[in-house]
């Protein structure tokens, strides 16, 4: 079995989401399992007008930025396709996802790779028979409240890719001081 662990917190040391994801990985991983690890802060290309336009031009006319974006996108898609279990750790930043996690989803959303258009025009996710664990943390936002835009967005993205089995592990409102 292959487990794909994705960390998105900008904080390398002292990150609660990273620590909880590591504990979860240690709990579910069997000795024979292979782990694919990706820290989204190590290398991420943000989709811009320049990179988005690269999707519409002939590969021979692409710039180095286009080529770098497609190389990373191909790698992210391959990692998703090869995995059986996906663990995504993410803190809530300003009520939503870290920018690197949004960039990851933009680069992983590829027609014919992670989703397709059916003849009726509706979309269908192509990454079936996978399970995802979302390790979501927050300082003040209560998860699954009207202020939490990360959890429903990430569930939607995974479902869009065809991943329907999603379990949330959460530690929210960790910075609130209830003694005051």
Language-model regions: role of each:
Residues 105-120:
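Conserved nucleotide-sugar donor-interacting segment of glycosyltransferase catalytic cores
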Residues 116-160:
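Short, glycine-/small-residue-rich phosphate/pyrophosphate-handling segment
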Residues 1-90, 95-103, 110:
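N-terminal beta1-alpha1-beta2 submodule of the flavodoxin-like/Rossmannoid cofactor-binding fold
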Residues 4, 36-38, 133-135, 167-169:
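Hydrophobic/aromatic beta-strand patches that form the interior of the parallel beta-sheet core
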Residues 10, 143-180:
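Glycine-rich phosphate/pyrophosphate-binding loop and the adjoining helix
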Residues 79, 83-84, 130, 161-166:
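A structural motif corresponding to the C-terminal end of an alpha-helix
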Residues 46, 96-97, 142-144, 177:
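Short acidic/glycine-rich loop or secondary-structure boundary segments that cap or lie
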């Amino acid at each position: 079995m292959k487990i794909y662990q994705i960390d998105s917190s900008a904080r390398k040391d002292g990150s609660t989401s990273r620590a909880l994801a590591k504990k979860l990985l240690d709990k579910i991983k069997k000795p024979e399992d292979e782990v694919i690890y990706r820290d989204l802060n190590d290398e991420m290309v943000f989709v811009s007008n320049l990179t988005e336009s690269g999707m519409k031009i002939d590969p021979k006319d692409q710039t180095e930025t286009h080529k770098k974006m497609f190389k990373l996108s191909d790698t992210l898609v391959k990692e998703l396709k090869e995995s059986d279990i996906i663990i995504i750790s993410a803190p809530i930043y300003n009520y939503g996802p870290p920018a690197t996690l949004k960039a990851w989803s933009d680069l992983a959303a590829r027609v014919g790779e992670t989703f397709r258009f059916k003849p009726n025009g509706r979309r269908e996710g192509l990454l079936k028979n996978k399970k995802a664990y979302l390790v979501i943390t927050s300082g003040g936002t209560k998860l699954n409240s009207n202020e939490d835009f990360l959890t429903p967005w990430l569930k939607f993205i995974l479902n869009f890719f065809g991943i329907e089995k999603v379990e949330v592990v959460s530690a929210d409102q960790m910075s609130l001081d209830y003694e005051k």
